[in-house]
Every structure is written in C-alpha cells, then in structure tokens.
A protein has these predicted regions:
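Cation-handling catalytic/transport regions enriched in His/Asp/Glu
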Residues: 1-182
Length: 182
C-alpha cells in the first residue's frame, strides 16, 4: 500500500521515476546513484568472501546480522595511543588524497576532536559542522581500542564533508544528502 501510494503520487507529480523525488531532495542525480551502485556491485564479491571467512573463523555455518560487527575469536586485544590513532587516520586519508589528509590533520591541530574519556561524558560519537569556522567538531570517547580508531576515521569523514560544505555552500543549502551521509 505504501509503495503503490508513492508510485501514484509520483505519477500525479509527473516525476520521471519513483526515485526522482528522492534525487531532488538529496541534490543528487541518477547518474551518481548508478555509479555508486555499479561500484558496490563490482566489489560485493570481496565483501562476501570476507563474510564467509569470518563465519568460518567463528565456527558458524552462516553469519547473523549481529555477527558482522562481532570481534573475531582469539583476535588480539590491541590498544592504541591517541597519537598512534591520529597517525593511522591521517595517513589513511593522505593515501587517498594529500589535501584531504591535510584537512584531517588540521582537525587534530586545531583541537577540534574531543576524544577524552571523562566522568559525565556520554559514550558514542558524532561530528557537528561549524560553518563560521569553516570546519567541524568531533566528539567521541576514545578508549584505545581498534573500533575507536575506526570511529575516529569515520567521524573525520563527516568532518571532510563539513569542511568542503562550509567553503562551497551557504548554511541554508548545506544539508548533506542521505545517500552520502553515512
């Protein structure tokens, strides 16, 4: 019923396809979505191989959704110092693009990342854009685990979007579309 209502609404509004309203709302074109889907399809076998290997290592015939993020059995309990995590994250971005790596380094240099674990601070992580400062702020609780390094890298991805957005858009036009938000 919901899908047929949506299709009917799109027909009434003369959209070319049922996706067109979402494309407009997210300021993205069909070509970009098609490219994203081709990239996923091109690489999905690698991800499937990883999942099969993980299931085997976990002694499971098939992974459940909850197993995807579960730690591997007997995996070393690695710990990272803040500076080590910083180096890993910045170098990962630099390996993609030197300029992007420099933006991430700037987040650390400007002390725009609050990773300290302290009493009263909630766990979790988020990145908030700071338009007037042409930057962003990241809040997370860095407990020195590998997952914290991943989270630090992930939130810096949002900061890169915010960095570019604050330099190329007006605040009223700056919302990141759902197709690239995460």
């Amino acid at each position: 019923a919901v899908c047929s209502d949506h299709v009917q609404m799109c027909e009434w509004r003369k959209y070319k396809s049922p996706m067109e309203s979402s494309l407009i709302a997210n300021d993205v074109d069909q070509e970009t979505i098609d490219s994203l889907m081709r990239t996923v399809e091109k690489n999905v076998d690698l991800y499937r191989e990883y999942l099969k290997l993980k299931a085997k290592l976990m002694n499971l015939p098939k992974l459940g959704n909850w197993d995807i993020v579960a730690p591997l059995p007997n995996a070393p309990d690695m710990e990272f110092e803040w500076e080590e995590a910083r180096r890993e994250v910045v170098e990962s971005y630099r390996s993609f693009d030197d300029e992007v790596g420099a933006w991430v380094e700037e987040m650390f240099e400007r002390r725009h990342i609050d990773g300290e674990v302290r009493k009263g601070k909630r766990s979790g992580a988020f990145c908030a854009p700071w338009f007037s400062g042409k930057s962003a702020w990241i809040l997370l609780s860095f407990n020195r685990k590998l997952g914290d390094v991943y989270t630090l890298a992930h939130e810096n991805g949002h900061a890169v979007h915010d960095y570019l957005m604050s330099r190329n858009q007006k605040p009223s036009n700056a919302e990141i579309g759902a197709c690239i938000a995460e």
